[in-house]
Amino acid sequence: DVYKRQGLLYYDGEYHLFYQHNPYERDWGNMHWGHAVSNDLIHWEELPIALYPDEHGTVFSGSAVIDYDNTSGFGKNGIPAMVAIYTADNPEKQVQCIAYSLDKGRTWTKYKGNPVIDSKAKWNSKDTRDPKVFWHKPSGKWVMVLNERDGHSIYNSDNLKDWTFESHITGFWECPELFELPVDGNKDNTKWVMYGASGTYMLGVFCLLYTSDAADEL
């Protein structure tokens, strides 16, 4: 069966879509990452399963990026790595892991240093999942928004492997998003939108640390 979509990206003439997938039955569970590609977003070709469960757990939600500058060192011979950042779930806890591909997502290698984030002890909570990662050009860093306990946390990294906690915003639940939008179409006046699966959102400013506009109203 097929569940949440994630990791939508465009690379070298193809759109890539990953999704939670149980290849064994129609019930929820045994999560893998399925993979499909398209050149027009209308017609899709289903590819072999991208990510399988391992000793860290089954494969929950996450995101995918192209490491054009080879910050991770995974790229070879001028080919940038496609890197998946995902939650591995097991009965004890949820941890964040990465895997990479050098053949446009057809085969994947999991990072030997997984997990890259294990924050159960920090939050005294098993609920640490759904990493959304993007490249923040002004700072020259990767940024991760991660659902932890009762809100979204922000981490940053130079290499997709080593992550530094920056801040935490309460009031959100699962599947975080953080993106920049122009105000009334004015690209010189932008706001950052932090969003959660419940439909909750905040507007604010972002430069590695996220500050909600609501804070100015308190």
Stretches with model-predicted labels:
Residues 2-6, 210-215:
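Conserved small/polar residues in nucleotide/adenosyl-binding loops
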Residues 4, 31, 60, 127-129, ...:
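Beta-rich catalytic cores
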Residues 25-27, 53-57, 170-172:
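Acidic-and-aromatic substrate-binding clefts and catalytic sites of carbohydrate-active enzymes
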Residues 32-35, 41-71:
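Blade-loop segments of beta-propeller domains
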Residues 41-53, 104-122, 154-170, 203-212:
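Blade-edge beta-strand/turn elements of extracellular beta-propeller
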Residues 181-184, 192, 201-212:
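Catalytic-core region of carbohydrate-active enzymes that cleave or remodel glycosidic bonds
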